[in-house]
């Protein structure tokens, strides 16, 4: 009886997962990306350079969590084994053309990420310890007046990012170390739990500081390997680019045909960069923005989508396509295909490098995923006791994931994430006018040559702003003087 029940549950989860990621989410997220791109006047292209400038400026030390730390934390969650294994699967299923559609969806997703992160900053709150918190649950409650909607989103995110994804990330780490070095999975799991506990028990600030250290190292190391493969095969690059375009548009036979390439590439891009999911918006709200305007964090997260997909996913694609592993059947897919490609190009030592990369990618994802979930736990309840219990449960799931096979958990997490995205897209479409006006205010100040500063008194139509956070310093001083007199 129990086995039949589990089979039915697994069948239902797989069906829902296929429906969400196979059709519904693709159309919804693409439509949202097109809408926001048009309404913002292709801002991801017009002001791309300005976004890069803000990421660099965000490294300045401030009292709180800097924009650069938030950028690194969101990248820690975005960049994982999916940027390696997922790209390999996309190419296997859809052919080289999948890469073209992956690029396209990322460019559209940059606008969606801009909108949701700007809204997260607008409706953020300050907790009892002076830490900024926000995200979709908060703008659903404060912007739409729908706490029930925020509650649903929070529960879905906690299931996906707090528990399931962290279990799978731990499982990937232990597999990598066990396969490369023969290490015992239980011992590895205990080490991962202790390292995770040290960081997540320090709260969002410690997570942000750890991400600031780990993410640049893992990104530079992986990009350096990809660049090495690119340089040693530079003569093949024009042909590879031509194949990507021809396969995408159906001018040349692809593994899955033009439609297969489109679906595989779009799905991979959406899943990788998380634009529209509402996940990165949770940490975006935690930034002490520089300059002091909500739209600045929109620019930062827009660049995050670009780096995740256009830079890192493309690096994986380059390694696979230039190595020659696609020229003949080899029975490999996913991370195995990437490993074979690296072995062909760089030799057996690349197995150790890939294990190292997986460790950094997965561990950084664990702590970043936790930070997303923590903000949503605090949305549901302000109880420190509940937060303490939640941290214990997260660490327990990390340990379980280290030693167990979790395919059903992974599929359930995908369903939670898909439903989470649908709820978030509905909210940001309903709040899009607020985002447009805030972003327009930023652009007007930028064009006039001043550092954009957000003055909440200029936006009487925006309700439920946290008192004092978004009134500029001059305005606050004027108010205080008036009250004194």
Where are these regions (language model features)?
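Flexible loop linkers connecting adjacent transmembrane helices
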Residues: 42-67, 89-91, 95-99, 111-144, ...
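Extracellular/periplasmic helix-exit of transmembrane alpha-helices
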Residues: 115-124, 225-243, 256, 285-291, ...
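Extracellular loop-to-transmembrane helix junctions
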Residues: 17-50, 92-130, 307-315, 351, ...
């Amino acid at each position: 009886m129990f086995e039949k029940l589990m089979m039915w549950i697994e069948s239902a989860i797989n069906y829902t997962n296929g429906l969400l990621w196979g059709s519904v989410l693709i159309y919804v997220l693409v439509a949202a990306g097109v809408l926001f791109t048009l309404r913002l006047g292709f801002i991801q292209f017009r002001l791309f350079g300005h976004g890069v400038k803000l990421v660099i400026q965000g490294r300045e030390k401030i009292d709180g969590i800097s924009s650069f730390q938030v950028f690194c934390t969101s990248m820690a969650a975005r960049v994982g084994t999916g940027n390696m294994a997922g790209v390999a699967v996309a190419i296997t299923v859809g052919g080289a053309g999948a890469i073209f559609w992956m690029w396209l969806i990322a460019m559209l997703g940059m606008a969606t990420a801009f909108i949701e992160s700007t809204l997260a900053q607008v409706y953020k709150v300050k907790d009892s310890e002076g830490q900024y918190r926000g995200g979709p649950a908060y703008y659903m409650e404060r912007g739409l007046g729908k706490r029930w909607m925020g509650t649903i989103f929070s529960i879905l995110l906690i299931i996906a990012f707090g528990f399931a994804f962290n279990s799978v990330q731990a499982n990937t780490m232990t597999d990598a170390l066990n396969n490369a070095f023969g290490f015992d999975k239980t011992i590895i799991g205990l080490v991962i739990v202790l390292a995770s506990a040290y960081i997540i028990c320090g709260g969002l600030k410690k997570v942000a500081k750890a991400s600031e250290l780990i993410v640049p190292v893992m990104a530079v190391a992986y990009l350096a390997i990809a660049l090495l493969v690119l340089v040693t095969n530079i003569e093949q690059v024009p042909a590879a680019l031509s194949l990507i375009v021809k396969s995408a548009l159906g001018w040349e036979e692809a593994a899955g045909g033009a439609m297969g390439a489109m679906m595989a590439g779009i799905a991979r891009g959406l899943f990788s960069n998380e634009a529209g999911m509402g996940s990165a918006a949770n940490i975006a709200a935690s930034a002490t923005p520089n300059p002091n305007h909500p739209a600045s964090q929109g620019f930062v997260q827009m660049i995050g989508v670009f780096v995740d997909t256009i830079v890192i996913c493309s690096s994986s694609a380059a390694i696979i396509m230039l190595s020659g592993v696609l020229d003949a059947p080899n029975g490999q897919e996913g991370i195995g295909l990437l490993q074979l490609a690296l072995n062909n190009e760089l030799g057996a030592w690349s197995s150790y490098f890939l294990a190292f990369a997986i460790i950094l990618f997965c561990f950084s994802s664990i702590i970043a995923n936790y930070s997303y979930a923590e903000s949503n736990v605090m949305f549901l309840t302000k109880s420190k006791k509940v937060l303490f219990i939640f941290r214990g449960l997260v660490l327990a799931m990390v340990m379980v994931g280290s030693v167990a096979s979790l395919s059903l958990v992974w599929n359930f997490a995908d369903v939670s994430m898909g439903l989470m995205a649908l709820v978030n897209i509905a909210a940001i479409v309903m709040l899009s006018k607020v985002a447009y006006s805030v972003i327009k205010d930023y652009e007007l100040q930028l064009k006039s040559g001043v550092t954009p500063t957000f003055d909440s008194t200029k936006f009487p139509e925006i309700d439920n702003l946290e008192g004092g956070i978004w009134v500029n310093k001059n305005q606050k001083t004027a108010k205080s003087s008036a009250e004194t007199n």
